[in-house]
Every structure is written in structure tokens, then in C-alpha cells.
Design a protein with these regions (language model features):
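A cytosolic-side transmembrane-helix exit/cap motif
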Residues: 27-32, 103-109, 125-130
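Hydrophobic alpha-helical transmembrane segments of integral membrane proteins
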Residues: 78-116
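Membrane-embedded alpha-helices of multi-pass membrane proteins, especially ion channels
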Residues: 17-21, 69-72, 93-96
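Alpha-helical transmembrane segments
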Residues: 16-19, 64-67, 116
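Loop-to-transmembrane helix junctions at the membrane interface
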Residues: 51-92
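N-terminal membrane topogenic signal
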Residues: 1-9, 122-126
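Membrane-water interface at the C-terminal end of transmembrane alpha helices
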Residues: 72, 112-130
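Hydrophobic transmembrane helix segments
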Residues: 6-60
Length: 130
């Protein structure tokens, strides 16, 4: 029960971080030598409009994870779904960094929180399997 509480708190912190306007870095080039970096929230449609749909997927899956964790307080069979959603969140974050060079400190913190919750879920699922 403590691990679920920690997991829910970590996911809520991740959602708060994703709502800040410094989550996704996007670089725009006004000329061959000029580059401007602007920052957007994970929930902003600006990165989605420029083809970077990984942040919005990460944000939506994080909300799904929170809902699954809340449902999992009463039912114990949501662990695998939470693990899959978290793995997809981490993969989407890394792909966004690699393909679009959209890495920021907030993005790294969000991915770290996802990783912490994934480790907690895997350890909890292995304890339940015994």
C-alpha cells in the first residue's frame, strides 16, 4: 500500500511538472545562423502541430497511469497495465529527445519519476506473484 501511495505521489508530481511551460524545448531557426529555443508544456498542442506527438502521448498516458493506480487501490490486477503505460511513457520521452532534440531538465525529471514508479510497480508485481 505504501508503494502505491508513493507511486501516486510521483505521478502527480510528474503531471505538475508536465503542466509547467518549460517541459518541451523546441528549437526554431530564423536564419542559417540564428536559432531560438522556446519551451512549451507537455499539454500544449504546439509541439504536436510541429510533428512532435511524443509529449502529448506521454502526458495522456501519465493521466491513465494515475487513474489505474487509483483503481488499483481497490483492485490488485492493474499492475501490468500500469507497467506497460509507464514503459511507453519512458520510450516516448526518449524518442522525443532523440528525434526532435527536445530535452529539458523538466523532461528528464518527468522521465526519472516515470522510471521510479516503473521500478516500484515491477517490484510490487514480483512480490504479488510469489
Amino acid at each position: 500500500m505504501v508503494k502505491k501511495g508513493i507511486s501516486i505521489c510521483c505521478m502527480l508530481i510528474a503531471i505538475i511538472l508536465m503542466a509547467t511551460p518549460s517541459g518541451i524545448a523546441m528549437t526554431f531557426a530564423h536564419g542559417p545562423t540564428e536559432r531560438v529555443t522556446k519551451y512549451f508544456s507537455y499539454f500544449s498542442l504546439m509541439p504536436f502541430g510541429y510533428g512532435n506527438w511524443f509529449p502529448i502521448i506521454t502526458a495522456l498516458l501519465t493521466i491513465v497511469v494515475v487513474l489505474l493506480l487509483l483503481v488499483g487501490i481497490r483492485k490488485a490486477n492493474t499492475g501490468k497495465a500500469v507497467g506497460v503505460c509507464l514503459a511507453l511513457c519512458i520510450i516516448a520521452s526518449v524518442l522525443s529527445w532523440l528525434i526532435f532534440a527536445s530535452i529539458s531538465i523538466v523532461g528528464v525529471c518527468v522521465a526519472a519519476l516515470h522510471s521510479i514508479v516503473l521500478v516500484l510497480q515491477v517490484s510490487q508485481n514480483s512480490l504479488l506473484a510469489k
